[in-house]
Amino acid sequence: VHETDIAAGRVLVATDASDRPVGVACVQGHAGEVDLADMFVDPPAIGSGAGRLLFEASVVLARGLGADRMTILADPHAAPFYERMGARFLRNAPSDAIPGRLLPLYEYDLTSGASS
């Protein structure tokens, strides 16, 4: 997450009932296509609905930016989550952080009625 993304209102934070942060997501890009970047849910909060809320809020934000698709370079352990959200697997793509590592790349169609 970059300071410019925070200033632009593109960073979303999920909190628990005590208002403690349990997850974060960042939408980066421009009209047409955006990336769901840096989405993370604290392991104890997995299964609480925080990930779904972050994903759905990211979809709303991306649509507000005028995007018609959102790409997601996912952690392999999170791949089933993105598939449940309706994202479509495209291919394996190089990791931005770890040279030589391939990660599943997904696409979410923002023109559909899902996750609105």
Task: Give the residues covered by each predicted segment.
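Acetyl-CoA-dependent GNAT
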Residues: 1-38, 42-44, 55-56, 61, ...
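Conserved acyl-CoA
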Residues: 53-69, 80
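Active-site acidic-Proline motif in GNAT/NAT acetyltransferases
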Residues: 42-44, 48, 76
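C-terminal "cap" of GNAT-fold acetyltransferases
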Residues: 12, 68, 73-77, 85, ...
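Short glycine-rich hinge loops at helix-strand junctions in the catalytic core
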Residues: 49, 66, 86
